[in-house]
């Protein structure tokens, strides 16, 4: 399999995304984006068991330190972020050090935020090992930790030096996490590319069988969609990047109310995508057949299409107001005018939203 490359250029900060097989064994590639002689690999207990030792061997001629997180969203906190910084300082890492995020979205987010803050900013490389991180979390420079009040409330924009996607890491990804990652691929198609959505409908059976040829193609397309949006609007100033939050205002509220880790992020995103599509249909933006196609595709993946019955409408609405997409005390929701065409709207008032959440 030929390694594919997607080039990102955010504010004159270019970096590559590599997508291929056996990239974690490619010494030249993994050393190419490290400018100094120090690295620190941040991973979690689950991923480290599979991939840490081979990656450390690549950097055997470097000062190579490691920090291993417990596995789970509930550990993406200021406490563990501070522990990473303490390890960097205590091991005397300099400004030319490079952090390597080996893991899923949690590892990438907290590692990137540590890199953004240590000595006012050092390099980091994303090595995402979950499908969700490969198509979304590792691309675009958003780094953050959670706070009890809300998800990703504390963070920074800090672009990686490279994103290295080894498809072989998907072989060790549990089925539930693999399917959760599909939600972000569906989201990318819904935002910008109706043809891509149709391709997903046609190829989903093969994708769920982890066909690497098809997976490489859809990961590349999802990465290109995110690349184009991030290149145009790195820090969500124009509204273009806000489109990437389709379904996420609902999803983040669901995650917080259930307790981080009870639902995987992609599972909450799936329910959020359906809520956004249903609301779009209610407001006469999206036709019923398109809504049905979205529900059918997510159901085929075995992802949730309803928010949990344990959450009531008042709780969900209140939690949604802790979202970063609130401006002038109004929720800015991402809605769909068609498959492949998302828009930002502040034309949904509380009364309408509460009625929608209560009655569907």
Curated annotation (Swiss-Prot):
GO MF, one annotated term: nucleotide binding
Positions that bind NAD(+): 71-76, 105-109, 129-130, 142, 151, 169-172
Cofactor: how and how many bound: Binds 1 divalent metal cation per subunit. Can use either Co(2+) or Zn(2+).
Gene Ontology terms: cellular component: cytoplasm
Keywords: Amino-acid biosynthesis, Aromatic amino acid biosynthesis, Cobalt, Cytoplasm, Lyase, Metal-binding, NAD, Nucleotide-binding, Zinc
Cofactor(s) needed: Co(2+); Zn(2+); NAD(+)
InterPro entries: Dehydroquinate_synthase, DHQ_synth_AroB, DHQ_synth_fam, DHQS/DOIS_N, DHQS_C
Protein role: Catalyzes the conversion of 3-deoxy-D-arabino-heptulosonate 7-phosphate (DAHP) to dehydroquinate (DHQ).
PANTHER family assigned: 3-DEHYDROQUINATE SYNTHASE, 3-DEHYDROQUINATE SYNTHASE, CHLOROPLASTIC
Listed name of the protein: 3-dehydroquinate synthase
Source taxonomy: Bacteria, Pseudomonadati, Pseudomonadota, Gammaproteobacteria, Legionellales
Gene name tied to this protein: aroB
